[in-house]
């Protein structure tokens, strides 16, 4: 009865293969997170700023602060 021969393990290119896999995975994940941030945070914030400044009246705000006595130089 002959002993069973085990196949030799691959010893070359292990680091390169792992680095390639992890670099691709990291790149794909970073693009996904960036896209989710843009859709979930940046676009909503941009819309909120646009809505605020569409209806913002600086003179009305200034007059309210002047009447409240916030400014010392404006009476």
Curated annotation (Swiss-Prot):
Q: Name one GO biological process term.
A: oxidative phosphorylation
For the Mitochondrial intermembrane compartment, the record's topological domain ranges are 55-75
Keywords, A to Z?
Membrane, Mitochondrion, Mitochondrion inner membrane, Transmembrane, Transmembrane helix
Record's keyword annotation contains Membrane: yes
The GO cellular component terms are: mitochondrial inner membrane
Give the superkingdom in one word.
Answer: Eukaryota
Which pathway does this chain act in? Answer: Energy metabolism; oxidative phosphorylation
Q: What Pfam families does this protein map onto?
A: COX6C
Q: Does the keyword Calcium apply?
A: no
Which family is it part of? Belongs to the cytochrome c oxidase subunit 6c family.
Q: What is known about what this protein does?
A: Component of the cytochrome c oxidase, the last enzyme in the mitochondrial electron transport chain which drives oxidative phosphorylation. The respiratory chain contains 3 multisubunit complexes succinate dehydrogenase (complex II, CII), ubiquinol-cytochrome c oxidoreductase (cytochrome b-c1 complex, complex III, CIII) and cytochrome c oxidase (complex IV, CIV), that cooperate to transfer electrons derived from NADH and succinate to molecular oxygen, creating an electrochemical gradient over the inner membrane that drives transmembrane transport and the ATP synthase.
What protein is this chain from? Cytochrome c oxidase subunit 6C
Give the species: Macaca silenus (Lion-tailed macaque)
Q: Which gene encodes it?
A: COX6C
